[in-house]
């Protein structure tokens, strides 16, 4: 089934060209089914790129999805045109009386700051608390995952000696988890971060389950049943060229920046990278949506009440 997004969103033409089924708003209202309402709180600098990445993964599932783009209320995006934000994004304070089957919160370029120094941290804490009463399933990515386990479980983040950048092997630890249905025993996904949270800091009484980790880069995916959340510490949603784009940006200001590990063939940045994580990205999002669909109430107003 297709994903329902605004007709004029730049992602529409990109996804249609890739063969992703995109449903126009006028067509969606003619289908006599309730679509899954999923919100995307997009904290990444390039909003258009990230919204396209997430919409691509949501749109590949067999259920109709209605995507709502959300921004922090008072934070001004500096790398995305103001007219795009005005046309397609809702401030969180304007949607926090609504209910969502699913809610995705992205990474953010603030991970080297203490959480309390992030300008929108107070609102971020309110968002996390709001998900417990207004959202059925939440997926936190990279910085948002670190922020969520800090908020809910008091888990600190630690600076890494150098940026972890590349495509790293991961181990599936709980293949019986519905979120890992179809996963290989090991697989590779992109990592791009300066900080980490540690398995040794998981509180014994937290209910957190480590689903995926890496001997090189540590925690990858945590299941948080008590908060109906998944915490993905890496960037499974990245495009083929995302790490390359970051690398070429970084060397403009830091010429000694290292080439992403296991990414360019032969570690030669002049050669085009290959995507080795696409299938697992689709599996994760598909499994997450399936679990959401199986358990969310048909009457969306009952979310948070049952």
Swiss-Prot record:
Per the record, the GO terms for biological process are: L-methionine biosynthetic process from homoserine via O-succinyl-L-homoserine and cystathionine
The record's GO CC annotations read:
cytoplasm
Q: What does the record give as its pathway?
A: Amino-acid biosynthesis; L-methionine biosynthesis via de novo pathway; O-acetyl-L-homoserine from L-homoserine: step 1/1
Q: Where does the UniProt annotation locate this protein?
A: Cytoplasm
Could you say which residues are annotated as the site Important for acyl-CoA specificity? Answer: 111
Which positions does UniProt annotate for substrate binding?
163, 192, 249
Q: Which leading EC class covers this enzyme?
A: transferase
Q: Which domain of life is it from?
A: Bacteria
Q: What is its main location?
A: cytoplasm
Where does the record place the site Important for substrate specificity? 192
One example of the protein's molecular function in GO is:
homoserine O-acetyltransferase activity
The UniProt catalytic activity note for this protein reads: L-homoserine + acetyl-CoA = O-acetyl-L-homoserine + CoA
Give the active-site positions. Answer: 142, 235, 237
Note the coiled coil stretches, chain numbering. Answer: none
What family is it from?
Answer: Belongs to the MetA family.
Q: What is this protein called?
A: Homoserine O-acetyltransferase
Gene behind this chain? metAA
């Amino acid at each position: 089934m297709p994903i329902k997004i605004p007709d004029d969103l730049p992602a529409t033409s990109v996804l249609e060209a890739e063969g992703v089924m995109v449903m126009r708003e006028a067509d969606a209202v003619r289908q006599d089914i309730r679509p899954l309402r999923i919100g995307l709180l997009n904290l990444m600098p390039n909003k258009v790129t990230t919204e396209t990445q997430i919409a691509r993964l949501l749109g590949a599932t067999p259920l109709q999805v209605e995507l709502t783009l959300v921004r922090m209320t008072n934070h001004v995006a500096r790398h995305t045109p103001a007219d795009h934000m005005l046309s397609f994004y809702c401030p969180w304070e304007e949607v926090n009386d609504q209910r969502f089957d699913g809610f995705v919160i992205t990474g953010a370029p603030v991970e080297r700051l203490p959480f309390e120094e992030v300008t929108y941290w107070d609102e971020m804490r309110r968002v996390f608390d709001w998900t417990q009463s207004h959202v059925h399933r939440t997926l936190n990515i990279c910085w948002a995952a670190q922020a969520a386990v800090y908020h809910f479980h008091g888990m600190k983040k630690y600076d890494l000696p150098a940026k972890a950048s590349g495509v790293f092997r991961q181990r599936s630890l709980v293949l019986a988890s519905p979120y890992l249905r179809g996963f290989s025993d090991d697989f590779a996904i992109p990592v791009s971060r300066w900080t980490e949270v540690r398995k040794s800091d998981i509180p014994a009484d937290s209910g957190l389950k480590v689903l995926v980790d890496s001997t090189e880069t540590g925690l990858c995916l945590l299941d948080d049943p008590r908060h109906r959340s998944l915490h993905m510490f890496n960037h499974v949603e990245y495009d083929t060229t995302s790490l390359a784009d970051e690398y070429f940006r970084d060397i403009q200001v830091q010429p000694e920046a290292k080439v992403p590990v296991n990414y360019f063939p032969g570690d030669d940045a002049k050669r085009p990278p290959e995507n080795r994580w696409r299938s697992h990205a689709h599996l994760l999002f598909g499994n997450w949506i399936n679990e959401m669909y199986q358990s969310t109430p048909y009457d969306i107003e009952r979310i948070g009440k049952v």
